[in-house]
A protein has these predicted regions:
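Extracytosolic ligand-binding ectodomains
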Residues: 1-131
């Protein structure tokens, strides 16, 4: 959410606004950030951290280096790459949409939550590894 109050989010929004202006993107200052943008931003930074740690772009070495690493996301939380399944530990936020299209965050977790890789609500998943 653009409305998340965190220094990391302020920096993320400022960088995005500068990019929009520099490239004269349609919509100008009305353009907003969104979850796919943040996910890409986090993913690329975590990949770069893993490449640096591995000292190579070799896929197996980078995958191994990603396990357990953290990155401070625009949400202000330090997200973690799970060591066993590479799912991302993230916070949960519930927001109420406002007239301006932004969200008022009405509830959020105090910490990141480990992802559940196999939903118990999808038939057949009970046979998959719990990792």
């Amino acid at each position: 959410f653009m409305s998340v109050k965190a220094p990391e989010n302020d920096a993320f929004k400022k960088t995005w606004a500068a990019y929009v202006k520099k490239h004269n993107l349609s919509g100008g200052t009305d353009r907003v950030t969104n979850d796919p943008m943040e996910a890409t931003y986090v993913g690329m930074h975590m990949w770069a951290q893993a490449v640096t740690k591995a000292g190579t772009t070799n896929v197996d070495a980078v995958r191994k280096a990603m396990a357990g690493q953290t990155f401070k996301a625009p949400s202000g939380f330090a997200l973690k790459m799970d060591e066993t399944n590479h799912h991302l530990w993230k916070p949960v936020m519930i927001g109420e949409i406002q007239a301006d299209g932004q969200f008022d965050i009405v509830w959020k977790t105090d910490k990141t939550i480990r992802a559940q890789p196999w939903s118990p609500f999808i038939p057949g998943n009970e046979k998959k590894s719990k990792m």
